[in-house]
């Protein structure tokens, strides 16, 4: 096994959950699990979604990203229509997004779109891939510390 994944610094950042309403889902997670909004909501017109990030505390290993549609042509509308929502994707941060994408393609993943800046990550680039087992992963470049 290659040591490249370790060099790329993959770290689980959040679990994305498709919801019809940020408000209702936020209230449910607050009352049921004690989660609270730690960032957002953000409207992201490029992704056609509105998102909020929730956690129990700032030190949580991974957050929950609630994803609601922004507009009628939002890509998550089909999931909401079929399943009513639920787990949508896993997001991993990486030290080198471009190298991570090359590595993912070498592992049989499919790149769904070229990297774009994301509002929720202060303009850091994100990319979407499907794994060979049909899992949707979001990759986000780590913050620059230069």
What do the PLM-derived regions correspond to, one by one?
Residues 47, 59-62, 72-73, 97:
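Short, charged/polar surface micro-motifs in flexible loops or helix N-caps
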Residues 2-8, 19-26, 52-55, 64, 70-75, 82-146:
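Vicinal oxygen chelate
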Residues 1-26, 85-92, 143-146:
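N-terminal beta-strand motif that seeds the catalytic metal site of vicinal oxygen chelate
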Residues 35-59, 119-121, 130:
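N-terminal strand-loop-strand beta-hairpin
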Residues 12, 16-19, 29, 54, ...:
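Short, structured motif recognition centered on aromatic/hydrophobic residues
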Residues 49, 59-61, 82-87:
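Short connector loops at helix/strand junctions that flank enzyme active sites
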Residues 31-43, 107-116:
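Short secondary-structure junctions
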């Amino acid at each position: 096994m290659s040591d490249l994944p370790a060099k790329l610094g993959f770290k689980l950042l959040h679990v994305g959950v498709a919801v019809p309403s940020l408000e209702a889902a936020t209230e449910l997670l607050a009352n049921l699990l004690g989660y609270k909004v730690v960032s957002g909501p953000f409207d992201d017109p490029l992704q056609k979604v509105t998102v909020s990030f929730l956690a129990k505390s700032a030190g949580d290993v991974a957050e929950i990203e609630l994803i609601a549609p922004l507009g009628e042509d939002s890509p998550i509308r089909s999931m909401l229509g079929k399943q009513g929502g639920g787990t949508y994707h896993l997001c991993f941060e990486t030290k080198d997004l471009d190298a991570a994408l090359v590595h993912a393609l070498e592992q049989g993943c499919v790149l769904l779109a070229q990297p774009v800046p994301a509002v929720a990550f202060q303009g850091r680039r994100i990319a979407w891939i499907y794994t060979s087992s049909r899992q949707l992963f979001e990759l986000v470049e780590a913050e620059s510390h230069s």
